[in-house]
A protein has these predicted regions:
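N-terminal helix-loop segment corresponding to the beta1-alpha1 unit
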Residues: 1-157, 161-167, 316, 345, ...
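Glycine-rich beta-alpha junction loops
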Residues: 25, 106-108, 178-183, 220-222, ...
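Conserved Rossmann-fold dehydrogenase catalytic segment
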Residues: 109, 135-143, 166-182, 201-208, ...
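Oxidoreductase and adenylate-handling cofactor-binding alpha/beta cores
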Residues: 129, 151-171, 184-196, 238-245
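Mid-domain beta-loop-alpha active-site segment that forms a flexible
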Residues: 144-159, 178-186, 229, 233
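Aromatic-enriched alpha-helical interface/lid elements that frame and gate functional surfaces
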Residues: 212-288, 292
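Terminal low-complexity tails and localization/encapsulation signals of metabolic enzymes
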Residues: 217-219, 300-376
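Conserved PLP cofactor-binding pocket of PLP-dependent enzymes
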Residues: 286-308
């Protein structure tokens, strides 16, 4: 649902012409409600839509012609689904040797490669859900993080394949997968286990790495996360907050020593922070250069002054509403990557794309009448 579209989004935002080939009824994510309502609008800006029935020979022939003129094809179907329709890498490569074919799956080659998968499936089997939740209750991360990660890695692979084609003149098969993306994200925990012999604890009960790395309440019932992770930062904190006794306490000389003293140190710091209003504390921490963060909800970002000032939110028209979504988290030559077009209506660009393949207006209408192609 998200892995393939997120790959296309990265390429589209970077300037590629990305054509979304979807069924005549439209991509299923267009109809999701509730927690899924944001999927389609977030991952489909800057794309064109061709709505076509791939179960029909005429529909497949049109897509073959489109692929013949394309640099890249991406697919995010169940294993074997496109092969059965005649769109295998081998067949398309024979038609277009320069084609880069990117397959986004649950698993790379190996014993699991034929399994269908989902973001949550691989979060569970890849250990991320264990590290996120409680020991007895694994919990998926609060975003489709593996779908997005797998799609982003796919885009990186495509860019590398394009660069390789400049040298060799040949296309290639690129594969990205959810399970391997999850393993990549939990690599630090795997390495910790092998290096120390200790099983990493979930984040909910994890033994701290830093002496001060906590959420604190403020005088006005606010909350701030504060991180003091270096000895220099500790010196700054003690000096600026007037806590000289903590500065000279031999038990707190290094981060490792502060970790051991957290049992009494964190309550002491909580008392200090509790004297301040949230905004006053935030202003002071920013002024002295210590890491901090308010505890925000996703919708709070719609009014975030940094995102608003930096062009980090893109305005889009979706279902007769105006919404705002984050831009790709990049600047190129000091410029944020913006929106060229809103998420497309089903088949919005069908006439344009079919004309580019040599179809006359009458031929396009015949395809519509046969329900092979859908237009708005």
């Amino acid at each position: 649902m998200v892995m393939g579209p997120s790959c296309g989004l990265v390429l589209a935002d970077l300037g590629a012409e990305v054509i979304k080939v979807e069924p005549p009824a439209g991509d299923n994510t267009r109809r999701l409600e509730g927690a899924g309502a944001g999927f389609f609008p977030v991952f489909n800006r800057n794309k064109k839509s061709l709505a076509i029935d791939l179960q029909r020979p005429e529909g497949r022939e049109i897509v073959f012609k489109l692929i013949d003129k394309s640099d890249v094809v991406t697919e995010n179907f169940r294993p074997g689904a496109l092969d059965r329709l005649g769109f295998s890498y081998e067949k398309l490569k024979a038609r277009n040797p320069k084609l880069i074919y990117c397959s986004l799956k649950g698993f790379l080659k190996g014993p699991y490669e034929h399994r269908p998968s989902l973001d949550e499936v691989t979060q569970m089997m890849g250990g991320l859900a264990y590290m996120t939740g409680l020991p007895e209750r694994p919990l998926r991360a609060g975003s489709s993080v593996i779908d997005i990660m797998g799609g982003t890695f796919a885009a990186v692979g495509i860019l590398a394949a394009l660069r390789s084609r400049e040298r060799t003149g040949r296309g290639q098969l690129v594969s990205s997968a959810l399970f391997e993306s999850t393993a990549y994200l939990v690599a630090q925990h795997m390495a910790q286990y092998e290096l120390t012999g200790e099983a990493p604890l979930p984040m909910s009960v994890k033994r701290p790495t830093w002496g001060v790395y906590d959420i604190f309440e403020t005088a006005d019932a606010g909350r701030l996360f504060v991180g003091v992770v270096t000895d220099t930062q500790w010196e700054v904190f003690c000096r600026e907050f007037g806590e000289q006794d903590l500065a000279v306490d031999p038990r707190l000389k290094s981060n490792g020593m502060r970790v051991k003293e957290r049992g009494w140190l964190i309550p002491r710091l909580a008392e200090i922070f509790k004297r301040c209003a949230q905004q006053d504390l935030a202003n002071k921490l920013e002024a002295i250069g210590l890491p901090f963060a308010p505890i925000a909800k996703p919708w709070d970002l719609l009014a975030d002054p940094h995102l608003l000032a930096s062009g980090g939110l893109l305005e889009m028209a979706v279902m007769k509403k105006t919404i705002h979504v984050p831009a790709l988290p990049l600047e190129l030559d000091g410029r944020r990557l913006g929106k060229r077009s809103d998420p497309p209506a089903v088949g919005q660009h069908g006439r344009e794309l079919l004309a580019g393949l040599g179809c006359s207006p009458g031929e396009v209408q015949a395809l519509v009448d046969k329900r092979i192609v859908a237009l708005p």
